[in-house]
Amino acid sequence: MAVPARHTSKAKKNKRRTHYKLTAPSVKFDETTGDYSRSHRVSLKGYYKGHKIAKANAAE
């Protein structure tokens, strides 16, 4: 089994981990429904790029 030859320092470990971060999801305002939604996804009301393509949920 492979084992590191040298101990990884805290600084080296933390420099590597600087790129592990969360990013906020891209959100756009949909003029058709008046809601905010994720880009390139069908809104909760069944609209995509201003066109009705799916039935809305029965919860509305």
UniProtKB/Swiss-Prot annotation:
Region Disordered, residue ranges: 1-23
GO molecular function, one term: structural constituent of ribosome
Record-level GO cellular component terms: large ribosomal subunit
Keyword list, A-Z: Ribonucleoprotein, Ribosomal protein
Annotated GO biological process: translation
Keyword Transferase: no
Record's compositionally biased regions (Basic residues): 7-20
Family the entry assigns: Belongs to the bacterial ribosomal protein bL32 family.
HAMAP family the record matches: Ribosomal_bL32
Protein name per UniProt: Large ribosomal subunit protein bL32
Organism per entry: Streptococcus equi subsp. equi (strain 4047)
Organism phylogeny: Bacteria, Bacillati, Bacillota, Bacilli, Lactobacillales
